């Protein structure tokens, strides 16, 4: 199996089309198809499922892709170090639920370790995608929460994927809403208080489920609900629609200056925020330092 074959497969997976990948790689489509078939035969697996509408990765293919990406990254590091005679790049990656404190901790990590040359990866994404990223070694670790509401299913999925979850700290849920919201003057807000207003939840794609939701109490039916895929949209909907979302309350003043506030939720629930690794995975120096930065955001009185 040649490195070039791995690069071909990564490109096909990236663009989702053998035809388009062949154009970008400046080779013929038959040559690319033959290379993929040869790799599949050598690996003893089917990497892509072909159909009239395009290609999709198989489960084995997704796992293969994770290892292939590691090989290519290591080759690039070798070339950087010994072919170009430049200092090697510092590399590190995180997949996280939509928390600003994880992003801020990442900024501090880059400031601390970012030398002249580095290749860092930070991905805010859905819960199940975080598990996939860690499992397929797209990233070094994943950040998510476990609660009483989702614990049984989450721990089952984590175990089935040969991953492990370690708690960093716990936090009480808070409601995020704009400072001009009718509920903004309350010291504590209940789910009942929130009923008249639009609820904002992050999209989880094909894994839409209360167990993979990033927001507590998402199983409670509401009349008004908006699903979004980025924090910028959430801010706009809070400001324009008196909408709200439920999160950890950690670092509450990050949103739109002073325009967004957080209020403790009355319901008795706890978010156990932690990190996910592959079984028997040892964190490198950057991983350990990133966890140190995250712990700085632990609530004083969870």
Where are each of the predicted segments found?
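Hydrophobic hinge/microswitch elements
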Residues: 135-138, 145, 204-261
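Central regulatory/effector-binding core of bacterial HTH transcription factors
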Residues: 89-153
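A short LG(V/I)-centered, amphipathic sequence patch enriched
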Residues: 40-57
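Secondary-structure junction motif
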Residues: 102-108, 151, 190-191, 195-219
């Amino acid at each position: 199996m040649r490195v070039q074959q791995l690069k071909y497969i990564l490109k096909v997976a990236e663009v989702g089309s053998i035809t388009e990948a062949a154009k970008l790689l400046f080779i013929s489509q038959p040559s690319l198809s033959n290379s993929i078939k040869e790799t599949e035969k050598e690996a003893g697996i089917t990497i892509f499922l072909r159909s009239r509408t395009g290609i999709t990765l198989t489960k084995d293919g997704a796992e293969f892709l994770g290892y292939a990406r590691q090989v290519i990254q290591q080759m690039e590091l070798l070339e950087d170090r010994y072919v170009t005679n430049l200092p090697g790049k510092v590399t590190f990656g995180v997949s996280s639920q939509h928390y600003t404190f994880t992003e801020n901790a990442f900024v501090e990590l880059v400031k601390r370790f970012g030398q002249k040359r580095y290749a860092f990866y930070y991905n805010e994404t859905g819960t199940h995608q975080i598990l996939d990223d860690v499992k397929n070694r797209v990233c070094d670790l994943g950040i998510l929460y476990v609660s009483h509401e989702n614990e049984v299913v989450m721990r089952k999925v984590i175990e089935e994927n040969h991953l492990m979850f370690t708690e960093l700290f716990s936090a009480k849920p808070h409601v995020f809403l704009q400072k001009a919201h009718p509920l903004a003057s309350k010291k504590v807000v209940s789910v009942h208080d929130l009923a008249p207003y639009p609820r904002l939840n992050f999209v989880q794609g094909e894994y839409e489920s209360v167990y993979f939701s990033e927001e507590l109490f998402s199983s409670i039916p509401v009349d008004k609900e908006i699903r979004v895929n980025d924090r910028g949209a959430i801010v706009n909907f809070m400001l324009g629609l008196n909408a709200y979302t439920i999160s950890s309350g950690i670092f509450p003043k990050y949103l739109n200056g002073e325009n967004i506030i957080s209020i403790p939720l009355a319901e008795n629930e706890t978010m156990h925020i932690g990190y996910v690794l592959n079984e028997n995975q040892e964190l490198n120096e950057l991983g350990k330092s990133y966890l140190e930065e995250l712990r700085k955001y632990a609530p004083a009185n969870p």
